[in-house]
Swiss-Prot record:
Signal peptide: none
Subunit structure, interactors included: Consists of a catalytic RNA component (M1 or rnpB) and a protein subunit.
Gene: rnpA
InterPro entries attached to this UniProt entry: Ribosomal_Su5_D2-typ_SF (IPR020568), Ribsml_uS5_D2-typ_fold_subgr (IPR014721), RNase_P (IPR000100), RNase_P_CS (IPR020539)
Alphabetical list of Gene3D superfamilies matching this protein: 3.30.230.10
EC numbers, comma separated: 3.1.26.5
Main EC class the enzyme belongs to: hydrolase
GO MF term list: 3'-tRNA processing endoribonuclease activity; ribonuclease P activity; tRNA binding
UniProt keyword Hydrolase, yes or no: yes
Family: Belongs to the RnpA family.
Reactions catalysed: Endonucleolytic cleavage of RNA, removing 5'-extranucleotides from tRNA precursor
Protein name: Ribonuclease P protein component
Keyword Hydrolase tagged: yes
GO BP: any one term: tRNA 5'-leader removal
Amino acid sequence: MLPRDRRVRTPAEFRHLGRTGTRAGRRTVVVSVATDPDQTRSTSPSAPRPRAGFVVSKAVGNAVTRNRVKRRLRAVVAEQMRLPPLRDLPVLVQVRALPAAAEADYALLRRETVGALGKALKPHLPAASEHA
């Protein structure tokens, strides 16, 4: 489970992701990534932290199916948030499950979510020349 401070919670944050986010899709998920305006304006000394939100509509299936998909997606994203480069970026991440996610096993959901997340994160990564 993601701690409360690591989740996208407000409708305004989800709207921000929808309007300004970089999207990457696969058969089972669409991942959107946007810079977190709260953390870029903040003057707090704490390290930047990514935050994630999940959208699983009724098109995915009944409540049991939607909750299973959401639990699996949360587990995948929580794992990725502990690893670089996502760990160190002040971004908002939205993972939207598509109807095909209902039939996908954990391995497929993980593979597609990680792939889409990597593609959506590319514009938010620091340029390689900055480190040289």
